[in-house]
Design a protein with these regions (language model features):
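Extended, well-ordered alpha-helical scaffold segments
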Residues: 104-116, 160-177
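Extended ligand-binding groove/face enriched in aromatic
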Residues: 175-216
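Solvent-exposed loop and edge beta-strand segments that line ligand/cofactor-binding
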Residues: 128-144, 197-212
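Recognizes extended acidic, P/S/T-rich segments that occur
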Residues: 36-72, 82-88
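Well-ordered alpha-helical scaffold segments within catalytic/enzyme domains
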Residues: 99-101, 145-160, 175, 214-216
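Pro/Thr/Ser/Gly-rich low-complexity, intrinsically disordered linker/stalk tracts
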Residues: 1-34, 69, 82-99
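Low-complexity, Ser/Thr/Pro/Gly-enriched N-terminal "stalk/linker" regions
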Residues: 97-139, 183-185, 189-190
Length: 216
């Protein structure tokens, strides 16, 4: 995609990337904070139609459905108010694989891996409990166990490099060695930023043998 982030006074997307899956397309770009973008997709006639308006740096188009044959689409990501006919610089073509068992397995594995790479806590490497936790940046030990397995599979399949997997695993092991434990067991949750145990309630200390089993 384009590496330019301004045209006149209009802030535009850059470093546009896209990946096609059997039932959707994942679009990503480098975002200019505060910008709004219109997502266009061309039909068979070559005309572009608006599919969404978003703020941020990614969009998933689930409107393509599935098909037994591979397909391709062209997208344009335009700043609000920017004419689509003049937006060829913000265009990207993407191939959609047929909905085979192999393609669906790739999709599931890649999206599972993304949770444990893109959404891993940056300092500890542990898996976050969820994206909307009102209690802060809470990480989970049981979920991290699933994440460690996903990292190994992702590296083996070439979705990430071995060095990327090792970086996250190294952070995780370093945190788990030093954090508070309970007769050898880890807590269910920790505050990723402070490293302190996050308990279920004031009546327990946070230690969790089940989550420890999932982790190890």
């Amino acid at each position: 995609g384009s590496s330019t982030d301004t045209i006149g006074r209009v802030r535009v997307p850059y470093h546009i990337a896209a990946e096609g899956y059997p039932a959707h397309v994942h679009l990503k770009w480098a975002d200019n904070v505060g910008s709004t973008y219109n997502i266009y997709r061309s039909d068979e006639s070559g005309k572009f139609r608006t599919y969404a308006q978003v703020s941020g740096n990614e969009y998933m188009d689930f409107s393509i459905g599935t098909a037994e044959e591979s397909r391709n689409y062209t997208y344009r990501i335009c700043p609000e108010g920017f004419p689509v006919d003049s937006a060829s610089a913000f265009e990207i073509k993407v191939d959609i694989p047929a909905a085979t068992d192999s393609a669906l397995l790739d999709m599931v594995q890649k999206y599972t891996l993304r949770y444990f790479t893109d959404f891993a806590h940056p300092q500890t490497g542990l898996a976050r409990e969820r994206s909307n936790d009102i209690n802060g940046d809470i990480v989970t030990t049981g979920g991290t166990g699933f994440g460690l397995m996903s990292l190994i599979v992702g590296a083996e399949r070439g979705f990430i490099t071995r060095e990327q997997a090792l970086d996250i695993i190294g952070k995780t092991v370093a945190f788990l060695e030093d954090c508070e434990k309970f007769h050898g067991a880890w807590a269910h949750w920790y505050d990723g930023d402070s490293g302190r145990t996050f308990s279920f309630s004031k009546y327990d200390n946070g230690g969790d043998i089940v989550e420890t089993a999932f982790l190890v």
